[in-house]
Every structure is written in structure tokens, then in C-alpha cells.
From Swiss-Prot:
PANTHER family, per database record: DUAL SPECIFICITY MITOGEN-ACTIVATED PROTEIN KINASE KINASE DSOR1-LIKE PROTEIN (PTHR47448), SERINE_THREONINE-PROTEIN KINASE STE7 HOMOLOG (PTHR47448:SF1)
Phosphoserine sites (modified residues): 223, 227
The keyword Nucleotide-binding appears for this protein: yes
PROSITE patterns per UniProt: PROTEIN_KINASE_ATP, PROTEIN_KINASE_DOM, PROTEIN_KINASE_ST
Annotated protein name in UniProt: Dual specificity mitogen-activated protein kinase kinase mek-2
Catalysed reactions listed for this entry: L-seryl-[protein] + ATP = O-phospho-L-seryl-[protein] + ADP + H(+); L-threonyl-[protein] + ATP = O-phospho-L-threonyl-[protein] + ADP + H(+); L-tyrosyl-[protein] + ATP = O-phospho-L-tyrosyl-[protein] + ADP + H(+)
Gene behind this protein: mek-2
Disruption phenotype: RNAi-mediated knockdown causes a defect in pachytene progression resulting in a proximal gonad devoid of nuclei. The phenotype is more severe in gck-1 km15 mutant background. RNAi-mediated knockdown in adults decreases lifespan.
Physiological role: Functions in the let-60 Ras signaling pathway; acts downstream of lin-45 raf kinase, but before the sur-1/mpk-1 gene product in controlling vulval cell differentiation. Required for progression of developing oocytes through the pachytene stage. Plays a role in responses to M.nematophilum-mediated bacterial infection by promoting tail swelling and preventing constipation. Involved in fluid homeostasis. Positively regulates lifespan upstream of mpk-1.
List of catalytic residues: 195
InterPro entries: Kinase-like_dom_sf, MAP_kinase_kinase, Prot_kinase_dom, Protein_kinase_ATP_BS, Ser/Thr_kinase_AS
Organism: Caenorhabditis elegans
Amino acid sequence: MSSGKRRNPLGLSLPPTVNEQSESGEATAEEATATVPLEEQLKKLGLTEPQTQRLSEFLQVKEGIKELSEDMLQTEGELGHGNGGVVNKCVHRKTGVIMARKLVHLEIKPSVRQQIVKELAVLHKCNSPFIVGFYGAFVDNNDISICMEYMDGLSLDIVLKKVGRLPEKFVGRISVAVVRGLTYLKDEIKILHRDVKPSNMLVNSNGEIKLCDFGVSGMLIDSMANSFVGTRSYMAPERLTGSHYTISSDIWSFGLSLVELLIGRYPVPAPSQAEYATMFNVAENEIELADSLEEPNYHPPSNPASMAIFEMLDYIVNGPPPTLPKRFFTDEVIGFVSKCLRKLPSERATLKSLTADVFFTQYADHDDQGEFAVFVKGTINLPKLNP
């Protein structure tokens, strides 16, 4: 994008990621789950009967797939690109099981590739209705294949391109699933997600919402560290200025994602009163931004697509966080995202405080995903509004 003409105004120099967990003194994922029987793990999660049944069915199917290799899979088509790799829909030839296979091409030593596959094996320990299921991983030449549960509704960034923006009630259900998924990863698997964004939130026609592409392999994270070529960043301000990754960083990314789902566009730079007025087809004086945030003194281009990558990163650090307009959204969701998007990590919400928030509790007991399931089914064959 910059072809050498843009300077890095932040002097970005992100700290290493692999050893951050081990330095914290926390148990590794393998240590955390190796000695706990599956039945006990599921009981501890407090799942509903439908959740337990669906998870058990997945594990039974998975039991029939002992190993994976290139010749065992038949590619059916491309599902999308994401985080350094292409994702294809595949069929396991022997069992007929449909999978999503992420293919990551890395020019690295064979020993490093094998170590990455070993680290990815921790995903076998993830048994949660809020985490996408894992079938296995293997290496073929310079390609690492990560085989996952197929979610027929695909990712929320794709859904968003089809419907424009999501109703608040569905964003409420998504919020519950994501917070519970992040909590499971942190408390049970002892890892942070590190890449929370709509494209890593998957949905299916059962109304389930699951996280994928989390940072279980430190070596894979490091191997892909120089491959960022995206036009968006969900990274928290403190990460862009060199601080270590914490759960607060995941919560910032989560909050930014929620705003995007609600307004239908990546919210950096933060929408102005004028843009919101156009979005909701009202006069500009009818737009009142939440949290008493006035028009920012920081004036970047209003269109995210026109921002160079380092302009965008500079805005995340120095510009105001996005805020939702009153009248068009409830006070509950406005307050919820505001708590996630505090610039200082020490002032940001925690996973525990989010679960006690009124917006979360409003949707926390909705076992019946029927309405959301119908919505997802209705989007599957829709064309994108802006292909």
C-alpha cells in the first residue's frame, strides 16, 4: 500500500509473543487439561442439554478420523482467505465428513513446521460450544493444513457483507458466545485469543457462534508475524505502542468488532455525527454520540478505505475510540461496547465484569437459538451487497 512512501509514525516494534505466557507463570494448555477427564471438563462448563448433545456428536464423528493427510481430503471449493492462509471446504474421503481446511504456506525449516503441528495438537483439548471443533493438522511440503469443523454460515465478516449490519439482539447473542469462548480459552486452556475480529467468529445454521484462529501456537504466530498485509487492524492501542499482550487486548478487539457488526463498517476512524446521520437517514442534529464524546479534534479521512495502514494504526493509538449514537442503540449496548473500548487497559472491562453487565445478562439465558438460526440460514445463499 505504501511502496516506501509512508513513514511509520509509531515506530512500531511489537514485543515477542511466544514466551509471554510462560513468563506469566501460568500453566500451559497441555498441563491444564491433560489430567482432566472429558466428562469432568464438560460438566464443569455447565452446558445446556442441546449444547452437550451437539458437542458429543462432534466428538463421536471426530473419533472416526484417526489421522489426516493430503490424499485423505477432497477439496470442494474455497471458503475465503484469512490470517495468512486460504480456507477451503473439504470432504474426508473415508467418512464423508465435511471440514474447513486452512492452508498456511510457510517457507520455514521442517523441524519448525513439525513443532507448529505439535503445538496445534493442543486444539484437541478444546471442547466448548463456543470454540470451533478441531479434527487435526498435518504438513505437506511447505504447507500446514489445519482441519476444523465446517460452519455453514461462515464468518461474521462475510455475513455482514450480505446484510449490511446486524440487529442488536443478534449482536447480544454473539457477545455472550464470544465472552464465554474467550473465558474458556483463558481459564481452561490457559491461552489468549490474540486475533479477535468478525472474520474469526463463525456461525452455523444451528444458531451456534464459535471462535476460531486463536493463538495456540506461539511458533506459528512468530512465523506469520511478518505476513501482515491487511487493510484493517483490531489490535489494541497498547499493543501498537509495544506493550505485552493481555486479555485486555482481546477485549478491545472484541469491542471494536461489536461496533463493526452494529454499524456495518470497520469503525476506524470513528464515525462522525454527519456519517451516522447519513447511515440512519436522519438530520445531523438528531445524532447524539454516547459518553459525551464530541466531534474529535483528530481529523483523519472519514473513509477507512482511504487511510494508509500506518495512518490507521496512528489513529487507533491517538484518536478517539468509536462510540455509538443514542436513540438508534440501547443504553445497554452503548455502555457495553464503551467499557470494552477504553484506551487505557486498566480502565477496560474484564471478562468477569462483562459477564455481570446488564447487556450480557439480557442474552445470557437464551438457550433457544432458533431465531438466530433462521437468520443465519437466510444469509447462506445471499449475495454480498458489495462484492
